[in-house]
Amino acid sequence: MIVSIAGKLVQVGEISVIIQAAPFDYEVYVGDYTRRQLQNQIGNEVRLHTLDYIEGNAQGGRLTPRLIGFSTLPERQFFDLFCSVDGVGVKKALRAMVRPVKELAVLIEEQDAKTLSALPGIGPATSEKVIAKLRRKMPRFALMVAGGEVADAMEVESPIVSDTYDALVTLGHSESDARKLIDETLATGKKFKDTESLLTAIYQRSK
């Protein structure tokens, strides 16, 4: 599987971009939010995290490999989860990626079915399915900082963020308050080896 691609951005289209990675030019499909981020990067060197999939019908005899690109690893991970919801799939998920992943994650976490259903390709029924399946998996994405990644001190794959979030909610904090406390602490850039050290830092900041 191709997990990333780096090269010169030579074209930005409506649903895909062209990256020149010598000696080949690759077409990479992107969501609208990523496309907007790349519009001013034509001619520059870029790197996209990628997923590949096969489009077409095996019975029809035409199968076409496709690449989907994301600016950050958490965006790719979110997309992978999004596609796992029954009735979503790759094409529908890609159409829906019109807002930052952090915003989408917050909508899911807060069960905002009305706003979710307004996303391209996502109606009321699908939005309810998305919330039911993904709500508990969203804290780590809802805590993404403005730069795209969870603060460099904390990789998104780490369970520390999710475990700390769960602990704060168990201790009586609201979901939004727990998210804010973690977000502010991670933004300091400090490193945390476990949930206990992150919780300690959070409460030290709150004093």
UniProtKB/Swiss-Prot annotation:
Subcellular localization, as worded in the UniProt entry: Cytoplasm
BP term (GO), one: SOS response
Region feature (Domain I): 1-71
Region (Flexible linker): 150-155
Matching InterPro entries: DNA_helicase_Holl-junc_RuvA_I, NA-bd_OB-fold, RuvA, RuvA_2-like
Gene3D superfamilies per UniProt: 5' to 3' exonuclease, C-terminal subdomain (1.10.150.20), DNA helicase RuvA subunit, C-terminal domain (1.10.8.10), Nucleic acid-binding proteins (2.40.50.140)
Cellular component GO terms held in the UniProt record: cytoplasm; Holliday junction resolvase complex
One Gene Ontology molecular-function label: ATP binding
Chain spans, region Domain II: 72-149
Keyword vocabulary terms for this entry: Cytoplasm, DNA damage, DNA recombination, DNA repair, DNA-binding
Region described as Domain III: spans on this chain: 156-207
Annotated family: Belongs to the RuvA family.
Domain topic, free-text comment: Has three domains with a flexible linker between the domains II and III and assumes an 'L' shape. Domain III is highly mobile and contacts RuvB.
NCBIfam families membership: ruvA
Quaternary structure note: Homotetramer. Forms an RuvA(8)-RuvB(12)-Holliday junction (HJ) complex. HJ DNA is sandwiched between 2 RuvA tetramers; dsDNA enters through RuvA and exits via RuvB. An RuvB hexamer assembles on each DNA strand where it exits the tetramer. Each RuvB hexamer is contacted by two RuvA subunits (via domain III) on 2 adjacent RuvB subunits; this complex drives branch migration. In the full resolvosome a probable DNA-RuvA(4)-RuvB(12)-RuvC(2) complex forms which resolves the HJ.
Function: The RuvA-RuvB-RuvC complex processes Holliday junction (HJ) DNA during genetic recombination and DNA repair, while the RuvA-RuvB complex plays an important role in the rescue of blocked DNA replication forks via replication fork reversal (RFR). RuvA specifically binds to HJ cruciform DNA, conferring on it an open structure. The RuvB hexamer acts as an ATP-dependent pump, pulling dsDNA into and through the RuvAB complex. HJ branch migration allows RuvC to scan DNA until it finds its consensus sequence, where it cleaves and resolves the cruciform DNA.
Name of the protein described by the UniProt record: Holliday junction branch migration complex subunit RuvA
